[in-house]
């Protein structure tokens, strides 16, 4: 059963195509670059469907598989990949949204409660929001952890579940093939950057 692999490395601005956040989408793969540390470094991330599974979060990647998965992509992507030596890799995982992640005097937050794919870049953001919501509920609970945790679950499960499911959808959108790919390109061609951001205002406006 194919899984999704993520390869990542950091590059200097002199090694990239353009000093900007750019995503190249292709059939069952995509490549994205985005700035780190105020633009002093760039993260380059390649995601593709793979038949391999490697346990862990920071394994040495297989450049042969990467080259094979991105064969036939545009010259810009090929030029970027040709500059690269050692990649790090991990397998992407999520699960179905759940309604509760608290029990008694114990609760979860972040990926432990609602693991999600990276396509919305919201895993860490949701964990931070969880922490804020949990602190608020505990402050209002009059010392009852069970009540605080129940209210915390109630306050968070829909928003985090929406992120989990939408991240999957974005993955399918990025990696589309055939007619789906053509329809995706037509839709994006007719949208401005502002329209794309507006569609996710519910997410990026925070809680």
Where do the protein language model's features map onto the residues?
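Conserved FAD-binding catalytic core of PHBH/FMO-like flavoproteins
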Residues: 1-85, 98
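Conserved mid-domain beta->alpha element of the FAD-binding
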Residues: 33, 65, 86-169, 173-175
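Amphipathic alpha-helical interaction/coupling elements
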Residues: 69, 148-151, 182, 186
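Short secondary-structure junctions and interdomain/linker hinges
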Residues: 73-77, 159, 194
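Short, hydrophobic secondary-structure boundary micro-motifs
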Residues: 78-81, 163-164, 199-200
């Amino acid at each position: 059963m194919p899984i999704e692999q993520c390869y990542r490395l950091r590059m200097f601005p002199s090694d990239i195509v353009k000093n900007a956040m750019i995503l190249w989408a292709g059939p069952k793969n995509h490549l994205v670059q985005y700035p780190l540390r105020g633009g002093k470094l760039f993260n380059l991330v390649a995601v593709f469907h793979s038949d391999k599974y490697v346990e862990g979060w920071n394994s040495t990647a297989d450049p042969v598989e990467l080259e094979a998965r991105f064969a036939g992509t545009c010259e810009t992507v090929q030029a970027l990949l040709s500059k690269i030596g050692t990649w790090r890799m991990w397998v992407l995982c999520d699960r179905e949204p759940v309604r509760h992640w608290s029990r008694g005097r114990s609760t979860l937050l972040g990926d432990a409660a609602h693991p999600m794919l990276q396509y919305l870049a919201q895993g860490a953001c949701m964990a931070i929001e969880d922490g804020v919501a949990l602190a608020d509920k505990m402050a209002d609970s009059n010392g009852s952890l069970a009540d605080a945790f129940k209210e915390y679950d109630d306050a968070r499960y829909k928003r985090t579940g929406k992120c989990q499911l939408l991240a999957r959808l974005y993955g399918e959108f990025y990696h589309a093939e055939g007619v789906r790919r053509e329809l995706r390109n037509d839709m994006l061609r007719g949208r401005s950057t502002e329209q794309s951001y507006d569609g996710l205002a519910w997410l990026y406006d925070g809680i």
